[in-house]
Amino acid sequence: MELLHKNITASILQSFFNVAKVLPFGLDKSFYINALANDIRQADFSVQTNKLVDIFYNDNVIGQLNFDIIVNDAIIIKVDTSFDFINNERQEKSKIYLKLSHYEVLLLLNFGQEADYKRLFLSNDYKQLQQSRGSGSNGLLP
C-alpha cells in the first residue's frame, strides 16, 4: 500500500530536519513554525500557517480547530517543543483532528532536545465507511 502524500511528506520531513539543525531547542513554538513554513515554501509547496478549519455537527459549524501549518491543502503539521513528545494524549488528540477534518495526513513534529516526528493518517474512505456503519459516528464530519 502506497503512503498517502508520500512525496510531500518526505519533503516536509527534510525541511523539518533542516530547521532542527539550525534552530536551537528552547525557542518559542512560533519561531519553529515560521522557519518551517519558509523552508517548505522554498521547496515550492503551498503553505498556510495558523489555519482555522471549520468543524461541523449536523451540517452546522460548531467551532474551529487551529492547525499550525497546512501544506498543499493536504497535510496538517502540528509543531511541538516538549520533552515528552510522543505521548498517548498528543497522539489521541491528533487522531481526533484527522477524524474531524477532511485531511488524511498529520505530521507531529517535535523541536525538542532531539528532533522527532510522528506521521498519522486516516483515509477519508475509512471515515466515510465508519459513518455509514454508524460506528462512532457523531456527525462531526462535514
Question: What are the language-model segments listed below?
Answer:
Residues 1-9, 130-142:
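Extreme N-terminal tail/first-helix region
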Residues 80-131:
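Nucleic-acid nuclease catalytic cores
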Residues 1-23:
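Interdomain/boundary linker segments immediately adjacent to catalytic/signaling cores
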Residues 25-76, 114-125, 133-140:
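Active-site metal-binding core of divalent-cation-utilizing nuclease and nuclease-like domains
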